[in-house]
């Protein structure tokens, strides 16, 4: 009976050791996969369109201001040409809110 208990304890110890090594290998593989996916995602990220530049090619590509993302506004300029012109602009409400936040930061500290 003592021999059976001794072998069962030895078996359980070896089994737990082998399972932890297998889990560690899976974790390291998962970390490597995640790092490669993050590297690919950074390569895919496209540059944003700065304020007052043309955004007609991609209307959702405007850069962020301090607090808010700029908005792509489209309009038709006066004159002979009837083509639509789009540019990234900061809405006035966002501009005023950013000014209030800046003033509050200087007052508070």
From Swiss-Prot:
Residues 45-88 are annotated as: Knottin domain. It holds the Pfam family Toxin_35. It is found in: Secreted. Disulfide bonds join 48-63, 55-72, 62-88, 74-86. Its main location: secreted. Residues 1-22 form the signal peptide. GO terms for molecular function: calcium channel regulator activity; toxin activity. Keywords: Calcium channel impairing toxin, Disulfide bond, Ion channel impairing toxin, Knottin, Secreted, Signal, Toxin. One of its GO terms (cellular component) is extracellular region. Residues 23-44 form a propeptide. The keyword Secreted applies. Expressed by the venom gland. Residues 89-108 are annotated as: Linear cationic cytotoxin domain. Coiled coil: none annotated. The toxin is composed of 2 domains: a highly rigid N-terminal inhibitor cystine knot (knottin) domain and a rather flexible C-terminal linear cationic cytotoxin domain that forms amphiphilic alpha-helices. Enhances the high-affinity desensitization of human P2RX3 purinoceptors. Belongs to the neurotoxin 19 (CSTX) family. 05 (U4-Lctx) subfamily. This is U4-lycotoxin-Ls1a.
């Amino acid at each position: 009976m003592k021999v059976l208990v001794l072998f069962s304890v030895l078996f359980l110890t070896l089994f737990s050791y082998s399972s932890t090594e297998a889990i560690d290998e899976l974790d390291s593989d998962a970390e490597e996969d995640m790092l490669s996916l993050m590297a690919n995602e950074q390569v895919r990220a496209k540059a944003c369109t700065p304020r007052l530049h043309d955004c007609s090619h991609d209307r959702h590509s405007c850069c962020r201001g301090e607090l808010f993302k700029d908005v792509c506004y489209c309009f038709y300029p006066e004159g002979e040409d009837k083509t639509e012109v789009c540019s990234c602009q900061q809405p006035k409400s966002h501009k005023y809110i950013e000014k209030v936040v800046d003033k509050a930061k200087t007052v508070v500290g």
